[in-house]
């Protein structure tokens, strides 16, 4: 408990084109070395590719992808009597979004397509269809939590 109180979390402004805070947060996650213009160009190009490929609204495809990526459970290490246990816990809503965006960007960067906007578009479309590396990461996280269900009573 801090003596001087908690700092208020800074509110993210919605992006100008889709008027979505989630898109704005994705731009921030994509950004390297403070180059927001480059990051937003990559994202909007990826959304154009999604529109061409699926014919659907890219924001809806992205939101569906995020719903398929965001984890509900995760494990946290807890030390009890000299041994560490992986204790399954529920993920808070803000952390769900953060983890989903992080996994989406990281696994997009690991793909083999030529340009980043192509990689991001393919990863978003794969995630919307419940396939892809970021969805696999979520499933692995859920499997870990399920496997360690016996230690759920160590929750704090």
From Swiss-Prot:
- Any one Gene Ontology cellular component term annotated for this protein: small ribosomal subunit
Read off the CDD domains from this record: uS7_Bacteria (cd14869)
The signal peptide annotation in the UniProt record is none
Per its UniProt record, what Gene3D superfamilies does this chain match? Ribosomal protein S7 domain
Q: Which domain of life is it from?
A: Bacteria
PROSITE patterns registered for this protein in UniProt: RIBOSOMAL_S7
For this UniProt entry, the molecular function terms from Gene Ontology, in alphabetical order, are: rRNA binding; structural constituent of ribosome; tRNA binding
Pfam families membership: Ribosomal_S7 (PF00177)
The keyword Heme belongs to this UniProt entry's keyword annotation:
no
Keyword Chaperone attributed: no
GO biological process, alphabetically ordered: translation
Keywords per UniProt: Ribonucleoprotein, Ribosomal protein, RNA-binding, rRNA-binding, tRNA-binding
Quote the function comment for this protein. Answer: One of the primary rRNA binding proteins, it binds directly to 16S rRNA where it nucleates assembly of the head domain of the 30S subunit. Is located at the subunit interface close to the decoding center, probably blocks exit of the E-site tRNA.
Q: Report quaternary structure and partners.
A: Part of the 30S ribosomal subunit. Contacts proteins S9 and S11.
State the family it belongs to.
Belongs to the universal ribosomal protein uS7 family.
Q: Which HAMAP family match?
A: Ribosomal_uS7_B
Q: Please give the NCBIfam families that the UniProt record associates with this protein.
A: rpsG_bact
Q: What is this protein called?
A: Small ribosomal subunit protein uS7
Q: Which organism is it from?
A: Leuconostoc citreum (strain KM20)
Q: Which gene encodes it?
A: rpsG
């Amino acid at each position: 408990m801090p003596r001087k109180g908690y700092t208020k979390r800074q509110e993210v402004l919605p992006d100008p084109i889709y008027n979505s805070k989630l898109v704005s947060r994705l731009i921030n996650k994509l950004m390297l070395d403070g180059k927001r213009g480059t990051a937003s160009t990559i994202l909007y190009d990826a959304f154009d590719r999604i529109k061409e490929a699926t014919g659907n609204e890219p924001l809806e495809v992205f939101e569906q992808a995020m719903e398929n990526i965001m984890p509900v459970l995760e494990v946290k290490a807890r030390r009890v009597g000299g041994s560490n246990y992986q204790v399954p816990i529920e993920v808070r809503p803000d952390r769900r979004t953060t983890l989903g965006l992080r996994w989406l960007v990281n696994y997009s960067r690991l793909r083999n397509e030529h340009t980043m906007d192509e990689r991001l578009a393919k990863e978003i479309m794969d995630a919307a269809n419940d396939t892809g590396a970021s969805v696999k990461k979520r499933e692995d996280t859920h499997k870990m939590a399920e496997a360690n269900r016996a230690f759920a009573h160590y929750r704090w």
